[in-house]
């Protein structure tokens, strides 16, 4: 939608900070195995200042944002002097294959974000809108997979300096071309079968960036054979530490969770995850309070209190600051019941 057609005026738009999101488009969906197995939408966001980045959002985050906006700006809002016609969010779906549901939602969610970011400046500057489109530390460290709906992002590369050329290239990441490839723009690297390409970066799952014969550009990874790969990236998996109580004693288990360390899970999701991991249905979840006593979790409010109390506590890298204690449901001996 052209700026002249948008509800906000051009002068208001020019006064926006450069880091405000002005467009967003879903690049792909990815399955995540966090507290639950779910699909997230990989969204490319463009800001007024021209920067681009990726964020990862679930449908329920769209739904939570829409609920807040309706309360604040909807026709029946009593909390704001300004109201407007908000875009329509695709409805919740309670049955069906998760991947198929996510795929079918993409066009409607793209339209939703386009219309949302075309609303007046006061909506764009709303704190919840800004947080939704903000790239968190968790977003920034994620490695995108295919990005099927976008061409790979590119960057201009300076020429290799003479000092760089002195380095032992046999130690550098490199690949051998299996087939001829002719780039369709100056950003793409053309080469012949048999050429050796020195690798500069991995754009995404399907595209690489490299240099050969004095030229630099991107190319599809399927056209080459890797001779020396990039060094292993640092593991970005987050872990949840659990203490499992049995008649024979207590064991410790760290569970891989693809969630932000600052996220707060739902009680039912935590319980389902623990039942799946320990293959037991008759379990109870607890956490340890500041006095060292176990407190049983029974609701989302209890989980929120656990997460809140753990903030600021020292913790290991990539380990959730709060810990779960998993006991048998009818075992109350682990609790300090003495007044």
Curated annotation (Swiss-Prot):
Binding site for a 1,2-diacyl-sn-glycero-3-phospho-(1D-myo-inositol-3-phosphate): 58-60, 92-94
Name of a matching Pfam family: SH3_1
Source taxon at top rank: Eukaryota
Residues annotated as domain SH3: 170-229
Residue ranges occupied by any PX domain in the UniProt entry: 19-140
Domain PB1 as annotated: residue spans: 237-329
Topology term for the membrane: Peripheral membrane protein
Alphabetical UniProt keywords: Cytoplasm, Endosome, Lipid-binding, Membrane, Phosphoprotein, SH3 domain
Primary localization: cytoplasm
Phosphoserine, modified sites: 315
Residue numbers carrying Phosphothreonine: 154
Compartment(s) of residence: Cytoplasm, Cytosol; Endosome membrane; Membrane
GO CC terms, sorted: cytoplasm; cytosol; endosome membrane; membrane; NADPH oxidase complex
Any GO BP annotation: superoxide anion generation
Single GO molecular function: superoxide-generating NADPH oxidase activator activity
Assembly and interaction partners: Component of the phagocyte NADPH oxidase complex composed of an obligatory core heterodimer formed by the membrane proteins CYBA and CYBB and the cytosolic regulatory subunits NCF1/p47-phox, NCF2/p67-phox, NCF4/p40-phox and the small GTPase RAC1 or RAC2. Part of a cytosolic complex composed at least by NCF1, NCF2 and NCF4. Interacts with NCF2. Interacts with NCF1. The NCF2-NCF4 complex interacts with GBP7 (via GB1/RHD3-type G domain).
The protein's role, per its UniProt record: Subunit of the phagocyte NADPH oxidase complex that mediates the transfer of electrons from cytosolic NADPH to O2 to produce the superoxide anion (O2(-)). In the activated complex, electrons are first transferred from NADPH to flavin adenine dinucleotide (FAD) and subsequently transferred via two heme molecules to molecular oxygen, producing superoxide through an outer-sphere reaction.
This protein's domain notes: The PB1 domain mediates the association with NCF2/p67-PHOX. The PX domain mediates interaction with membranes enriched in phosphatidylnositol 3-phosphate.
Annotated protein name in UniProt: Neutrophil cytosol factor 4
